[in-house]
Amino acid sequence: MKKAAIITVGSELLEGLILNRNAQFLCQELKNLGYRVIKVSTVGDHLEDIAEEVRSLLPEVHLLILTGGLGPTKDDLTREAVAKALNRKLLLDYNLKTKIEEKVKKYHSKIPSNIEKQALVIEGAKVIDNPVGSAPGQLLEVDGKKVILLPGPPKELIPMFESLKELLKTPHAFYQVVLKYYSIPEAVLEDLLKEILYSQDRVEVATMADHVEGVRLRLTTSAEHREFLDELVEKILEKTGEYLYGMNDEKMEEVVVRLLKENKKTLAVAESCTGGMLSSLVVNVPGASDVFIGGVVAYSNELKKSILGVKEDTLRKYGAVSEQCVQEMTEGLKKLTEADICVAISGIAGPSGGTPTKPVGTVFIDLFEQNHSTVRYNFSGDRNTIRTRSAMMALENLRKHLKERGRS
């Protein structure tokens, strides 16, 4: 198996100011392409430090990827450092300079004088087009090895790396399927599947869990065992299909919007503790406007009464965090928006506000189409975790409701 290494450049990474998402993305992608990543290092914006890391790692690997440091400013030094490490010249590419200037003109009336720096190309390098930003990447061949320079922003790096995947693929490329679940605990899922998963040795199994994507079951095998993996997935879905919400890169909100379209249903939401988080997740999906009418953030009791028609008597008897309150929220929302399906969330996200009968993490979610479906949850975690889990569980309830509707 070919070896690879990654150098992420940027003092902001060493200072903990931003997360190193590029390393995570590249490690996953390189494994699937058949590489063994032997090292990921982070280097600050210092020319000699970057050059020394290149000199140190290149003899050990078949592929070396550097990210960051390709901008136009004084501390963007990756081009210069790689050129120095390889003892190659930096050459100004006038055609590239013109292309970069044309891109910059679309967003700025004046072209910065330092933009020329981004048109410096290491001797012998092939330019990698950046479809999103102004900083092009570079690809070099060095004694049969590949050295790739990519910009730091993930929104630029990811599409540029995607354009290189065919070039980088090895005979040892992996085939991977990720199955995503939300309303089933990781331990329960593994127990359901242990006989299927662990009675074979051709597929590597890994489970991961978080409050955003739920439980992810990652199945990886070599390309030669692809058919076996496909058959294994079929067996898994026979046992756990009712809990599955998506596969691979699918997000819960994308699945819900698709199901709303398939069922020809519209949606409106009323939120209290989530403060618009559920609405935000839905509208992040392209095409959501076809099915999403809108949302109301009714954080105070006054707004719950004046906009959604929640009764004063209900709030006094049962409180804002109650089955009765969320049901009146969805009923009022339905009158207000005439949406086919209405969802309401009200809860105690903390850190204060809990009581013995309704501790922090108590959340009520109601889904109302023709009848109410109300569930009380007791989520753990900090304030943001409770809010996120509430919004995601509302989506999961919607998904299950729409799937059931599609079967009837």
From Swiss-Prot:
Which Pfam families does the entry mention? CinA, CinA_KH, MoCF_biosynth
Record-linked Gene3D superfamilies: 3.30.70.2860, CinA-like, MoaB/Mog-like domain
Give the superkingdom in one word: Bacteria
- SUPFAM superfamilies, per the entry: CinA-like, Molybdenum cofactor biosynthesis proteins
What InterPro entries does this protein's entry cite? CinA, CinA-like_C, CinA_C, CinA_KH, Competence-induced_CinA, MoaB/Mog-like_dom_sf, MoaB/Mog_dom
CDD domains referenced in this protein's UniProt entry, alphabetically: cinA
Query: Would you identify the family this protein belongs to, as annotated?
Result: Belongs to the CinA family.
**What PANTHER family does UniProt report for this protein, alphabetically?**
NICOTINAMIDE-NUCLEOTIDE AMIDOHYDROLASE PNCC, NMN AMIDOHYDROLASE-LIKE PROTEIN YFAY
The entry's protein name is: CinA-like protein
